[in-house]
Each structure stands twice: as structure tokens, then as C-alpha cells.
Amino acid sequence: TDEAITSGDLHRYVPALGSRQRDLLFVWLPGTGAETQEFQNILGVAAYAGYRSISLAYKNNVTVNRECGCTESECESSCKPDYPDCELEVRREIVYGDDTQVSSLACDSPCVDVSRADSIENRLLRLLQKLNEDEPSLGLEGFYDGESVRWDKIVIAGWSQGGGHAGIIAKDYEVARAVYVSKGAGAVAQNGMPVPVPWASLPRQT
């Protein structure tokens, strides 16, 4: 779909199978280390509900907990467990890529290295463009506009790490719906107790 994508380009697409095709796209983000084909049943349920459905491959070999849990003295301060915005910054780079601006905020964490090409957003955009080029009858042209994903037409969902990325997208954009399965955000310690990371309480577009 894009020659600049370095790995994990094995996506899954399922057309709508129900009697009523919705004008929405269901996008599923797998968890850490999971393969797109492992969630075929979830795509099937979405398809029978009338959604065209995609299980999107991305750089899910990067784990947020590991990248934000560095305890070595040479670690960047923003990659250590006591830095509250590490998860937000790491997830934004995985979703949008480094050196990217979203909602006037830079997406460039020193804890990970995910290019714009390898980002979730670019992978989804290039997949939609490729599918529409190869099979125009699928009717996917309404889910992107030029070089931009039409997030307002997308139900974004994910499991574990993928659920957290879905949460970031729903924070930054108005999406059709958002579903977090077994995690929407991580936790930080406060007075010896785990509480949701700060970004979970920030104003949201969705």
C-alpha cells in the first residue's frame, strides 16, 4: 500500500454482510504482538451489522508500558515511569508518526521511533486508497478525502494496546463511535494507588 511502510502490511478487509449496509467503516486495532487474522470473528460480527470492516496491521511490537517504564540512568526523563504524559506522547507517535502536528500538538516522543509512513493513520489511508483503486465497487472513497482520513465516518475500536490507540484517536477527532476492549488508557501511581493516565481526562472531540 505504501513503499515507505517497513513492516506489518497484512491487513484484513471484510465487506458488509447484513441486509442494511451502513455508511460507516469499522476499523479494528489489534493488541501488542497480535495478528490481524486473530480477530476475524469480531470483523464478522461488525460485517453482519452492516459495517465494512478492517483489521489494521501496525507497529504493535512496540509496547507502551515498556517504552514508558525505563529505569536506567541514561533514559530520557520523558520515558520514565514518573513522567505522566509518556503514554500520551508514545501513543500519538504510533498513531500519527513522528514530526507530525495534530490539533496543534507535535507527535514526536523520544521513547519510540515510528515514521509517518508506519503510523496507524497513514496505513489506514493508504489501505483505503489501494482498495478503492483496485475495487471501486467496494465504495470506500467516502472514508477518506484526498490525503486525509474521514474519521467522522469511522468506528474506531481496538483491544489492549489497540484500545488505547482508539482512545487517542477519539480524543483528537470526532469519530462515529469508539470502542475500547480491555483497555482504553493506562494507569499511573497517585498516593500509592493506580489512577488513569492524565490524557484520559483531557477534553475530547468524541
Q: What are the residue ranges of the model-derived segments?
A:
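Short beta-to-alpha linker loops that shape the active-site pocket of alpha/beta-hydrolase fold enzymes
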Residues: 57-62, 184
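Conserved hydrolase catalytic core segment
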Residues: 168-177
